[in-house]
Structure formats: C-alpha cells, structure tokens
Amino acid sequence: HPHVSENGKFAVIHNGIIENYVELKEFLISQGVTFRSETDTEVVAQLLEFYYNECGDFFESVGRVLRRIEGAYALGMLCADCPDRIIAARKDAPLLLGFGEGCSFLASDATAIIRHTRDVVYMDDGEIAVLTRGGIQLYNAMQQPIEKEHHHIEWEVSAAEKGGYPHFMLKEIMEQPDALRHAIAPRLRGGEIVFDDLKLTPEKIRGFDRIFIVACGSSYHVGMVGKYNLEHLLRRNVEVALASEFRYSDPIVDDKTLVIIISQSGETLDTMAALREAKKRGAYILSIVNVVGSSIARESDDVLYTWAGPEIAVATTKAYSTQLAVLDMVGLCFAKILGTVKEEEYADAVRELALLPDKVKETLGHCEDIQKYAAQHFHHESVFFIGRNLDYALGLEGSL
C-alpha cells in the first residue's frame, strides 16, 4: 500500500477484503485496463480511475465504486487532481476520523493518532468522509451530509508506548493489576456491585429465560469461564457460542434472550455479524468491550467497558483479565437481583474482587521464579495444557 491506478491518478490504502474483485478485474481488463499486481486493493484504484474518466468528479467516482464493490473495507482514497483531500469509506472494518488544529486524520485505531489529537469520530458502515486541512465532512450511504457525535480519547500517549519494556506483551502483562483496578474499583461501592452505566432493569433481568455468551478467540475462552460461573450463580442455562458459528446455527433466540457479546476491539467482524443476527431475532444485547465508541459498543443495547487501555501485543493479557473480571461481576450482580446467591457467598466474592488487583500484582512480583520455569520449558516444540472445569478454559487460552 498504497496501490495506484494505471495512469497514476488515484492511490488507495485498504484494510479488508474485496470479495468480488475477480469479477471487477475481468471487467476492467475487458475495458483495456492493465494491472500491476494480483491484489484485490488495486481493483479499487483502477475502478476509481475508470469512473473518473467517465464523470470527472472525485466524490461521484467514489460513490460509483462503493456501489460496485462487495466485502469488508476501510478505504482511504486520493486523487492527483484534488491534492487537498482524502476520501474515506467503511464497511465491516474499523475506521475513525481525527480532528486537529488545521489538520485531519484517518486511522483504523486510535493508537495511530493519539499523539496528534484526542478528538475522534467513529465511522459507521456505508458512511463516506471527505478530509481536508480545514476539517472533515461526513456523508451517509445516500451521500447526504451528516453530523456525528465526537468522542474524547481518555488514555495517555504513554499507554501506546513500550515504557522501557523490551516489548508490548511484557508491558501489558505487568499492567494487569492497574487494568483490573480500573475495571473493578469504580463498580464496587459499600460492599455492593454497582453498574452506573447499565440500563438493564431488575424487571428485564428477571424476564430473561435464556443467556448466550458470544465471542471469538480469547474472548470465547472468557465466555467459557463465564458459562461455568453464571450457571453456578444464576441457576439458569447459559450457552457459549463461537461468533463465527452463531449465525449459521439457527440459534433459539427471542425477546426473552440475553446475548452477552465480548470483544476487546469492539470491531471483530464475526462478532458484529452475530450481534446483528441476535438483534434481528429480538434479543437484548449486552456487550463487554474495551474500546470506547467502537462498533459493537454503539450497536449494543447496553455496554460495559473494561477500561484496560490500548492492547497492542497480538497475544491478549490485560484485556483477557479484565473481561473475566467484568463478566464475573455481571454474574454476581444478576444473581443478587434474582436471589440465587447466598448473602455470604456474594459478600465473599465482592471482597475477593476488591483484593484481586493486589493479588495479581503480588503474583507478578515473582518474576525470577516465572523466568526459571519458562527457561525449563521454552525449548519444547509441543506443550499439552490439561485441566477441567475452569482450568479447561484456561488451558485453551494457554494453548492459543
């Protein structure tokens, strides 16, 4: 990236997959267009130039391209005849806009622009944005101008830096005590779990007769732990489903179903699709996500943030820990409302939650012991993680 059109008039950057690129490429070749690569992204650049030669208008050309392409995309498009602007578009791929003094930004994640601005807008599917130095104009799928809510990024620039650690994963492992404290402490008050940001009423909670936990990857493993805990606390059937399979399984979901969606980024494509399928069937959607203002957060009926800060390493650490904590708190909160947990068990669990950040900090203080065990085993080519019940889910996460 960027990919450039045949005559160099257009350049495109792209996250996602253009699913019908073969069909479009064959059409363009039949029109005499010469391709430089085998990528799906180049089709967008070539198609832009093809339509621009017909209509002579950058914005109109973008609209025509978007009506032809199928798949998931976050696009940034430039035209040599309009050097003062970038046009952006999204469908099923994260894209946000940053607003600065005399400058505008386009990124797939806030970590890319936090050094320059904290004022962002999250684009939704079908939207188009025109970026100039003077500002940004947003349009809906009908290409009508729209205004959207701005979000302020709360975390510090240092959260997206290594801070003296050799790599982000070690840094994020060591950040777990603080991340857990941020997720837990504001929600504990006078020995009670209090979700100020939860719209669910006790009456609504009592009305659910089925609970699904839906997620992908590590978040799915959190869901497996959640199934054990919630069934114990609520004495209700809880199903955990891989988001990629959920919408194809014809799930039994209706307006008495609570679907708990878990995602660190809030942009996981399969999880988004599962959310929309559940919502279409009438389910109430409660999401547990880390990224404020993300697509899953915006499309849910209710959202609980984990407030773990940016997680840059590929292998999850603090996001996983905070998801576990928040989901456990949800179970305890609901159990108190339903009357399915003894007062003593509830009080003990709340006390343990309050102590959890310090206990994790104490565990991470044994770095030399951890290093010793790692040195004994790191050279093995295969490892079996064996456990049952909660440890089975932990074993799956360890193997991942």
Where do the language-model regions lie?
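Short, well-ordered alpha-helix to beta-strand connector turns
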Residues: 7, 117, 208, 256, ...
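Glycine-rich phosphate-binding loops that contact phosphosugars or nucleotide phosphates
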Residues: 206-355
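Conserved beta-strand elements of the Class I
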Residues: 11, 87, 212, 258-260, ...
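Conserved short alpha-helical segments that host acidic/polar catalytic motifs at enzyme active sites
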Residues: 1-166, 171, 175-210, 248, ...
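Flexible loop/turn segments at secondary-structure boundaries
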Residues: 20, 84-85, 95-96, 114, ...
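Short, basic, glycine/proline-bearing loop/turn elements
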Residues: 47-52, 258-263, 356-360
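Generic structural signal for well-ordered, non-membrane alpha-helical segments
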Residues: 17, 21, 37-41, 55-62, ...
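Active-site phosphate/pyrophosphate-binding segments
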Residues: 176-180, 184-212, 302-400
